[in-house]
Structure formats: C-alpha cells, structure tokens
C-alpha cells in the first residue's frame, strides 16, 4: 500500500507501507465489536440504587393480614410500594467489561488502518520532533503539514512533543502500543513515523 510521505513543508512523496498492516480487507463487524468492547472496558460503575433492606422504612406492618379486603402487605419497603427498594438495584460494582481475544483485536486494528489508508487518512513522516515544548511551534508544524485533527503515532513520545501538543484540542500523540481503535477512527488524519510503522508491523504483523 502506497502512503503519502510528508516533509516539513507538507510536500508529499510516496512511501511503500507493508500490506500486512495497510492492505487488509475491512471487516465492519469485527471493528464494531472491538470498538464497543474498548468503550465498555473503559466504563466504570457510577450508578447506585437501594434494595428493600437499604431504604429507610418502618418495620411495622401497614395493616392487619386479613379482614380489610386489601392486598397483603408486610412492609413499606417492598418494591411494590412507592418509596420502596428496588428489586434488582444497580450497583457501582457492576462489571461492564467485554473480552476480546488478542488475535481478534490485532485483526481489528489492521482492518481499521487499512481502511484509513484507502480513504487517504494516513500519512507518514520520517520523525516528529520539536526544538522546544511550545504549543505555538506544534501548531505551526501541523499547519505546515496541512493537519488539524490528527492522531500522531510515534515510536517515542519525547517531552517536548508531549508538552507542546497536550493543549491542542484536536491533536493526540501516542506510541504504537497505545493506538486504540476509538482514537484511530475519531481523528480525521493519522500521522505515523517510519519507526512507528516498523513497531506496528512487529506488533500486528
């Protein structure tokens, strides 16, 4: 698969990327599965409800068992009553995680990268470095490359790049092992350094 190789002025040449990573068919069902699993695994329980033992209530029987013509009632904490406990309350300890096999996850990442390459949303650079940790420098460099919303995948995130890009709203910088499916899809472009492509090939190939 041929990708654009950009220089510092944004001029493009051609880079031959490995087909093992960028030449796969798009598997929509698999990509959907790993994205949903990624979101589920990032979710934490934040809902809490009370069951009938936890709500504040009296243990007095509302009325006698027989003779009133009304339905039997033992306590006002019953789930049948307004203000009573829930029969099956939500708990912060709920586990939302979904298991995805490593082989499936890697295949899904390859599928996403291949589709992004076909849509011309992947570009390559030799390296991505900055002289100092200034957001202005990072913004100017990305502007010269013609990039605004971009995920930068580099073999090693140095301190200058991290500090300079963390305040840019539509820019993220990660190492290959942290390139998750949601981020790959979210950003308009993916910029990858040559050493990072070698690492991706080693991880996913």
Curated annotation (Swiss-Prot):
Protein family per UniProt: Belongs to the universal ribosomal protein uL4 family.
Listed HAMAP family: Ribosomal_uL4_B
Gene Ontology molecular function: rRNA binding; structural constituent of ribosome
Compositional bias ranges of the Basic and acidic residues kind: 48-57
Any one GO biological process: translation
Keyword rRNA-binding: yes
Protein name: Large ribosomal subunit protein uL4
The protein's assembly and partners: Part of the 50S ribosomal subunit.
Chain spans, region Disordered: 43-95
Record's compositionally biased regions (Basic residues): 58-69
Function: One of the primary rRNA binding proteins, this protein initially binds near the 5'-end of the 23S rRNA. It is important during the early stages of 50S assembly. It makes multiple contacts with different domains of the 23S rRNA in the assembled 50S subunit and ribosome.
Family annotation (Gene3D superfamilies): 3.40.1370.10
Entry keyword annotation includes Ribosomal protein: yes
Keywords: Ribonucleoprotein, Ribosomal protein, RNA-binding, rRNA-binding
Entry GO terms, CC: ribonucleoprotein complex; ribosome
Annotated Pfam families: Ribosomal_L4
Organism field: Bordetella parapertussis (strain 12822 / ATCC BAA-587 / NCTC 13253)
């Amino acid at each position: 698969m041929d990708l654009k190789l950009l220089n510092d002025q944004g001029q493009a040449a051609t880079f031959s990327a490995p087909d093992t990573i960028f030449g796969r068919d798009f598997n929509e069902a698999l990509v959907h599965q790993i994205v949903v699993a990624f979101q589920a695994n990032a979710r934490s329980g934040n809902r809490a409800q009370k069951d009938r033992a936890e709500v504040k209530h009296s243990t007095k029987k509302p009325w006698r068992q027989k003779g009133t013509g009304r339905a039997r009632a033992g306590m006002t904490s019953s789930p049948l009553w307004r203000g009573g406990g829930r029969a099956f309350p939500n708990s912060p300890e709920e586990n939302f995680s979904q298991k995805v096999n490593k082989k499936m996850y890697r295949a899904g990442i390859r599928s996403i990268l291949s589709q992004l390459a076909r849509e011309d949303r992947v570009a390559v650079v030799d390296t991505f470095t900055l002289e100092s940790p200034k957001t202005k420098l990072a913004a100017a460099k990305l502007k010269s490359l013609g990039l605004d919303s971009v995920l930068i995948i580099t073999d090693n995130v140095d301190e200058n790049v991290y500090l300079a890009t963390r305040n840019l709203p539509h820019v993220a910088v990660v190492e290959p092992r942290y390139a998750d499916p949601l981020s790959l899809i979210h950003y308009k472009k993916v910029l990858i350094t040559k050493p990072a492509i070698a690492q991706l090939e080693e991880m996913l190939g």
